[in-house]
């Protein structure tokens, strides 16, 4: 199981195929997505990689986080996340994952925070039908109607669909196809819509319900921090004390 990446949503556009067909795509940008540390079975009880993306000023960081970035020998990151991986898919600490970590044609799962809609009624939030337009209905055309029984059960049950805050939910969209990658600019173009607003952080992983293509690099496509060039072969994971 390979690692995912942390990307930032740029927006939507479209690309044209050789036959003239246009495909709506979402542009995701990798902003110096580097490995910050490893989680091992011996130390933590599970295997994972901690990644960081974006940039952040050191003056705004707590001391504990400063030490974490110092041990990894990377610049402070704005977004930090963990990805579960198999032991043979660990990438060296400090390495920067490239956009061609994903290959054209493969499917990915993307996770983001949906756009906030504020307080919404039952029709917008839950797709309720509302009340009738005439036949005695006044003012309450868009109300949700009754929320419970009369004598039995005599109450409104918990988790009843009602008006309330809508949006700002963690949403995962499955099986989006990778249409194109741009290593020089760090861009990944996926077919379809991705949850979240422009500038929002997105986690991109290999699709769990699709077979990984045979040409997908393992453990991944990355560039070493010491300028050793792009790598695809597995490298031994160095022990990171305190990471």
UniProtKB/Swiss-Prot annotation:
Residue ranges that the Swiss-Prot or TrEMBL entry lists as coiled coil: none
GO biological process: translation
A cellular component term, taken from the record's GO annotations: cytosolic large ribosomal subunit
rRNA-binding listed as a keyword: yes
Modified residues (N5-methylglutamine): 151
Alphabetic keyword roster: Methylation, Ribonucleoprotein, Ribosomal protein, RNA-binding, rRNA-binding
Region: Disordered, residue numbers: 139-164, 218-243
Ranges of Low complexity composition bias in the record: 231-243
Keyword Phosphoprotein: no
Post-translational modification: Methylated by PrmB.
Top-level taxon: Bacteria
GO molecular function: rRNA binding; structural constituent of ribosome
One matching Pfam family: Ribosomal_L3
Annotated PANTHER family: 50S RIBOSOMAL PROTEIN L3 (PTHR11229), LARGE RIBOSOMAL SUBUNIT PROTEIN UL3C (PTHR11229:SF16)
Classification via HAMAP family: Ribosomal_uL3_B
Subunit field text: Part of the 50S ribosomal subunit. Forms a cluster with proteins L14 and L19.
Entry function: One of the primary rRNA binding proteins, it binds directly near the 3'-end of the 23S rRNA, where it nucleates assembly of the 50S subunit.
Similarity-based family: Belongs to the universal ribosomal protein uL3 family.
Entry protein name: Large ribosomal subunit protein uL3
Source species of the chain: Rhodopseudomonas palustris (strain BisB18)
Gene: rplC
